[in-house]
């Protein structure tokens, strides 16, 4: 095992034997080290009634050499980690780690799989896999993701989702026309087979974000004449249908999502000069600000039971929703509006662009990222 601290993050690596390379386990955790501190290895039984004895052998402490080159995206390898976090305990569980960029998980309606995009395709990955950190010395090999057949749509971006009844997949894809994003719907059977996409939006670029609880309406973001606003179309529409514009304020409006009862569409807007969460009725009326804080808040997502809203929060100094930033997933209680921190991570763009709650409302799926040295040999 190797623990490496770089900047404000601590990384855990696991090796499978002498001479074998250490592989990152994913889920880097920000650790606020400052000044003098002690380092070491500890063991916990996670049970107050259990006393454990452990022997650590072959332990070395190696500081980075003076003048070592800082790790940046240009001189490092990017690792993506699919994680889940429990709402009640904030315990994070690693599901899948890959030396590549994948993005924006959805959790299927039956709870059996995750969907995410990678290299222009949509992939399916089983939800019931052991955490490689807690699975023991010889964890079982991780299964590989399986691509869903999306026919000609091979430039899918990170705005995709699943219909309320679990039978259809909506994608945003850049394969046709001028290669600007368009919204499509395709049938799926158990999130396995796929099919020919049906084009929904006539105009581009358009990016899907929300599906009404009754399955009849899609909400999406479109750039029209230089302004990004929120629009809707029937889920049964074809590319000849006219879209309905819901927002007209100057500045970016993004991330529309319906509440589970269908009474509101929540979204993020910078119309006040500061990105905050807003809401409106499904016809665009009664637009009002929801969050009023010093964070830049993006992408509101609701638990299926309607009790919680999660959002992606950047420091107020960050413009837009870039990748490779220190961010927080923050949880708002819909009962009293109280906001708590659910997870701190390195990510941003692609972490939770789309709905990713578990069907039982107990967990949230997201993607975190790590920038690590391209080679990490074992000693």
Identify the residue ranges that each predicted region occupies.
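Extracellular glycan-recognition regions
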Residues: 1-70
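Sequence signature of WD/YWTD-type beta-propeller architectures
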Residues: 68-379
């Amino acid at each position: 095992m190797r623990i490496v601290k770089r900047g404000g993050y601590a990384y855990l690596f696991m090796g499978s034997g002498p001479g074998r390379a250490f592989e990152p386990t994913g889920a880097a955790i920000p650790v606020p080290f400052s000044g003098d501190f002690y380092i070491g290895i500890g063991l916990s039984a996670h049970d107050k009634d259990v006393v454990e004895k452990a022997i650590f052998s072959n332990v070395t402490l190696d500081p980075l050499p003076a003048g070592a080159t800082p790790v940046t995206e240009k001189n490092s390898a990017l690792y993506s980690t699919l994680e889940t976090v429990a709402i009640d305990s904030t315990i994070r569980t690693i599901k899948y780690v890959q030396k590549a960029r994948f993005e924006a998980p959805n959790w299927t309606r039956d709870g059996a799989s995750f969907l995410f995009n990678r290299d222009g395709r949509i992939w399916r990955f089983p939800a019931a896999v052991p955490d490689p950190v807690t699975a023991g010395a010889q964890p079982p090999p991780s299964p590989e993701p399986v691509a869903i057949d999306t026919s000609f749509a091979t430039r899918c971006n990170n705005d995709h989702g699943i219909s309320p009844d679990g039978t259809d997949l909506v994608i945003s894809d850049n394969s046709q026309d001028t290669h600007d994003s368009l919204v499509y719907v395709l049938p799926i059977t158990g999130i396995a087979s796929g099919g020919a996409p049906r084009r929904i939006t006539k105009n581009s670029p358009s990016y899907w974000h929300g599906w009404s609880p009754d399955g009849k309406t899609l909400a999406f973001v479109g750039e029209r004449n230089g302004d990004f606003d929120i629009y809707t179309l029937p889920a049964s529409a074809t590319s000849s249908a006219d879209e309905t514009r819901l927002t007209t304020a100057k500045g970016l409006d993004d991330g529309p999502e319906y509440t589970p009862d269908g009474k509101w569409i929540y979204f993020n807007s910078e119309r006040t000069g500061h990105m905050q969460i807003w809401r409106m009725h499904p016809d665009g009326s009664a637009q009002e600000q929801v969050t009023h804080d010093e964070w830049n808040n993006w992408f509101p997502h609701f638990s299926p039971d309607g009790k919680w809203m999660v959002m992606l929060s950047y420091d107020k100094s960050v413009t837009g929703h870039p990748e490779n930033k220190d961010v927080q997933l923050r949880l708002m209680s819909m009962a009293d509006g109280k906001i708590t921190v659910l997870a701190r991570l390195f990510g941003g763009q692609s972490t939770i662009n789309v709905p990713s709650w578990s069907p039982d409302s107990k967990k949230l799926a997201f993607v975190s990222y790590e920038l690590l040295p391209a080679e990490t040999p074992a000693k």
